Amino acid sequence: MHPDAQLKTALKNGFDPKLLYKEPLTTVKEPVCSILEKHSKVPVDKVVSHVNEVRDRAFAVFPYACIGQFSFVELSIADSPCYREMLERTKQGHKLLDLGCAFGQELRQLIYDGTPPTNLYGSDIQQDFLNLGYELFLDRAILPDSQLIAADVLDKQSALFERLAGELNIVYISLFLHVFDFEKQITVAQNVLDLLKAEPGSMIVCRVTACRDQEVLAATQERMPYYYHDLASWNRLWEEVKKQTGVKLSVESWEQPDELVKKHPLPGIYILGSSIRRL
């Protein structure tokens, strides 16, 4: 199901998007504050109002949690144990795609930390999200729009596959897979493998919303058509991918601290980090 259709389904089933709307910020946390000041050249005294204004414009059109709760200014990529490797590899010329990148905020972290923008790609199904990223970071002159691709990862005829199939070294996926059911996630994983170079060391790094309580998980899926993993289902997903593709993969997973957990309305939620490397 398309994410927009999922949102409409959730609203029809009684979900109140106001639950996803956080009061305007009074401060902007690091590293986004410094990125906006130094990368985007937003005046120091305008940073907070700039972020609030972009959020309100975006939420009026797309009442998603990532927008309403300012997730786009709570960067997480640097919290991954794989970040130093991703940063060094992209500095050396390896190509990274942030799949489901929303505003492309994690790409700006990599650029701020020294990765050449031409080694980075972002893709989201919503072109408007990519545009809002430019509204937030004011950096069209730094990150060419040719590096950002509006596409559906399930559509292998899309510009994403036309341009990048077999060309990438790393794909980063953060809080995106849960919008697909288990079977669709298998397809997404297979498609992502097709975007990567077919060589040892090609890597997928994931940040996944997970749930320990299967009863809560089942109730959530009845109300909102999302699929939150637990560790067992996550491992089962990749075993199935290996079985169907014949590709040898090494999967490592861990629980990682995350601000999202503190404000998530469901009990038993945690963030599952994972790296999937081609052998």
From Swiss-Prot:
Check the record and name the InterPro entries matching this protein.
Meroterpenoid_MTases, SAM-dependent_MTases_sf
Which biological processes are named by the entry's GO terms? methylation; terpenoid biosynthetic process
Q: Does the keyword DNA damage apply?
A: no
Under the heading Gene3D superfamilies, the entry gives: Vaccinia Virus protein VP39
User: Which Enzyme Commission numbers does its entry carry?
Assistant: 2.1.3.-
Where along this sequence does the record place binding of S-adenosyl-L-methionine?
D124, I125, D152, V153
For this UniProt record, the keywords arranged alphabetically read as follows:
Methyltransferase, S-adenosyl-L-methionine, Transferase
Claim: Transferase is one of the keywords in the record: yes
Query: What pathway or pathways are given for this protein in its record?
Result: Secondary metabolite biosynthesis; terpenoid biosynthesis
Q: Which EC class is the enzyme in?
A: transferase
UniProt GO molecular function: methyltransferase activity
- What's the superkingdom here? Eukaryota
**Function description:** Methyltransferase; part of the gene cluster A that mediates the biosynthesis of the fungal meroterpenoid acetoxydehydroaustin. The first step of the pathway is the synthesis of 3,5-dimethylorsellinic acid by the polyketide synthase ausA. 3,5-dimethylorsellinic acid is then prenylated by the polyprenyl transferase ausN. Further epoxidation by the FAD-dependent monooxygenase ausM and cyclization by the probable terpene cyclase ausL lead to the formation of protoaustinoid A.
Reproduce the miscellaneous comment text: In A.calidoustus, the austinoid gene cluster lies on a contiguous DNA region, while clusters from E.nidulans and P.brasilianum are split in their respective genomes. Genetic rearrangements provoked variability among the clusters and E.nidulans produces the least number of austionoid derivatives with the end products austinol and dehydroaustinol, while P.brasilianum can produce until acetoxydehydroaustin, and A.calidoustus produces the highest number of identified derivatives.
Instruction: Report quaternary structure and partners.
Output: Homodimer.
Q: Which family does the UniProt entry place this protein in?
A: Belongs to the class I-like SAM-binding methyltransferase superfamily.
Q: What name has this protein been given in UniProt?
A: Methyltransferase ausD
Q: Which organism is it from?
A: Penicillium brasilianum
* Gene it is expressed from: ausD
